[in-house]
């Protein structure tokens, strides 16, 4: 990388041949590592954004113009080398106002590329112009940050990128397997309970009484029903053994024909 932040064509060819891009003996890629391409013509702003990204454990490549960014991505000519298909860039963060090529023009170039159109692009600007923000978002920008960029902004971008990297590297492929394993662990459903109409005879209620004898009249019912004496046996013995009878008792026992 040049001192001004650019990547020369010679340096890019060395990275391709030695192992920086598409090398044979390159280090294994960490799934949690996020590679960010930072583009800004201001040296101070470029240093600030690079430090913020490194604080959040991001791998940073910083360049000073949109043309340098296209060179690094292999989009500076119509025939891009096949080696750049292996280039891993998870995020591109670029300034809006730059000489030669603005951040909006760089955004359009990236979205027109078949290799990097899915890479999220974040635009930075020190001017809060709504028309500029809307135009970048409509073109496909992931976010629009106002300078000076804060550490909270970078952490928010970092958290979203980490989730996307993990999801694209395994979670989507594991979803069908997990669902099948859950279904296989469940017991088979029991057959539905059916009641056959022939299993038991239908319940019928007879309207005829079980007793075939004719109904009794009220007089017969009264005469045939046993009368319970309200006087106990002991009281009866006392009454019969008494030599004197009360007038009420004698009056009841006296026959009306004898009077």
Swiss-Prot record:
Amino acid composition bias (Low complexity), ranges on this chain: 195-220
Annotated stretches, region: Disordered: 165-259
Pfam families the UniProt entry points to: Response_reg
Signal sequence segment: none
Residue intervals of the Response regulatory domain: 35-162
InterPro entries according to UniProt: ARR-like (IPR045279), CheY-like_superfamily (IPR011006), Sig_transdc_resp-reg_receiver (IPR001789)
Sorted UniProt keywords: Cytokinin signaling pathway, Nucleus, Phosphoprotein, Transcription, Transcription regulation, Two-component regulatory system
Family named by the database record: Belongs to the ARR family. Type-A subfamily.
Name of the coding gene: ARR4
Gene Ontology process terms (BP): circadian rhythm; cytokinin-activated signaling pathway; embryo development ending in seed dormancy; protein autophosphorylation; red or far-red light signaling pathway; regulation of DNA-templated transcription; response to cytokinin; response to red light
Name the UniProt record assigns to this protein: Two-component response regulator ARR4
GO molecular function: phosphorelay response regulator activity; protein serine/threonine kinase activity
The organism's taxonomic lineage, starting at the top: Eukaryota, Viridiplantae, Streptophyta, Embryophyta, Tracheophyta
Physiological role: Functions as a response regulator involved in His-to-Asp phosphorelay signal transduction system. Phosphorylation of the Asp residue in the receiver domain activates the ability of the protein to promote the transcription of target genes. Type-A response regulators seem to act as negative regulators of the cytokinin signaling. Modulates red light signaling through its interaction with the phytochrome B photoreceptor.
Known tissue expression: Predominantly expressed in roots, and stems of young inflorescences.
